[in-house]
Every structure is written in structure tokens, then in C-alpha cells.
Amino acid sequence: MLTKHEPALKDLFNRERNRFLQDPPALQLLLPQRPLILGLAGCSGSGKTTLARELTAQLSATLLPLDFYYRCLSHLPPEERAFQNFDHPDSLEHALLVQHIEELADNCSIERPIYDFTTHTRVPNRTETIAPAPVLIVEGILALHYPPLRALYDFSIYVNAPNEICLNRRIYRDLRERGRTEESVRAQFDATAKPMADLYVIPSAQHATVTVEGTDALDWSVEQVLQRLHQLGLVRPGQHTGSVDQ
């Protein structure tokens, strides 16, 4: 049985609730904050991964490289896998990447694939759990190519670098990290990496919020990005570990 005060209290509660729900700033306090999502692209060897890692440290971000989303080639004989075009947009399972970014944007964890570059396959029965974070950085040569990906970004970066610099860096990386030979890296660069960069990667620079030079000092590239984020109000003072002149 309702007491004589309960109807009035119920009406007051309903009025206050409706007022609160109609107040976007107040309502925002109740909702989980969507992460700031940055897209970072550039040709292979341009320096984009180095920049992405430094920005990840500066912004306490989660880094999501496109490299983990290469399609698994376990259905092909090993001798055929190395001849696939890994620089074409179809080589990546970009629909899964979009799904994972959307889930992280909704503050849900994901199970990210683990890719083995020596066998060109995904490691079976193994994933890495990636938890949501206030800042998410999506990095890869084609990070600015796919329209569904670009639609998720709040800010995007393109790293520009000359072909010869890119090739030399790619040789050094693939020999050290991916168990390849210099001959195979040069052959792939001429056959697919450079042609695909001309077709898909370099044109995607037009979608970038800011372009930095991969031959510049790393701290200057980081400074340019952080300054632009500040100017756009996407990063608050004190939100990163470095210093930016205001």
C-alpha cells in the first residue's frame, strides 16, 4: 500500500529523471566514454610503426596493427604462400578489423588474431585479448584505404617517405624480424609493394588529418601530431606523457 507521500515522491523522481535524460552533458556522465580512435598509415618502411609505438606510449593508448589481420594461407601449399600479394587490400581481413574496432569503441574486449609471418598463417587456437582503452591507434599500410575503417577514426595520420628509404628499412626489418632474405624482400618490393603503394597507399594520404615526414626526427613527428590533437580539442593538456607547447 502506498503512503500519502509516495505518489508525490514518485512524480518528483519521474520529473527529475526525464530532465536528466534530456540533458546531454548530464547524460554523458552516465555513459561509458567512447575511445579516441586514430588511424595511422604510410608505405612499408616509412616509419609509421615507430611513430605509432611512440604515440602509443605518449597517449597510454592501445595499438592495433593491421599486420595481425592478414588472411590465413594455411589452405595453400607452403611454397605458394610467399608468392601471394600481401600489399593488396584483399590480403587483409578488413571486415574483422572493423568489427573489432567497433567492439573496442563499445568498451568491449576483443580476441585479436596472432599472425606468423614465417608461415603466412594465423597461429591456430591462439589469440591475444585486447582490452578497451581511452585511446586506440590503428596502424598499417592500408589503414586509411578502407572507407569503413576511415569512418571510425576521429583523427588520422599519414607518414611520407622516399621509396629508397622505405626499401632499405623494409630489408632491415624483414631480415631481422620475419626470417626473410634480402633478395626476396627486394623482389617483393619491386613486384607488389611499390606498385600497390602507388595504387592504394599513397593515394590514401588525402584522407589524413595531418601528414608527417618519415625522415624527420621522431620527436618532431610526435610533436606535430600532439599539437594538432590539442588544436582540435581531442587531447586535453596532461593527457599525454610528453610536453607540447601550447
Question: What feature does the model see in each segment?
Answer:
Residues 57-65:
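Post-Walker A helix-loop "phosphate-sensing" segment adjacent to the P-loop in P-loop NTPases
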Residues 38-39:
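Short hydrophobic/aromatic beta-strand immediately N-terminal to the Walker A/P-loop
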Residues 44:
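The conserved Walker
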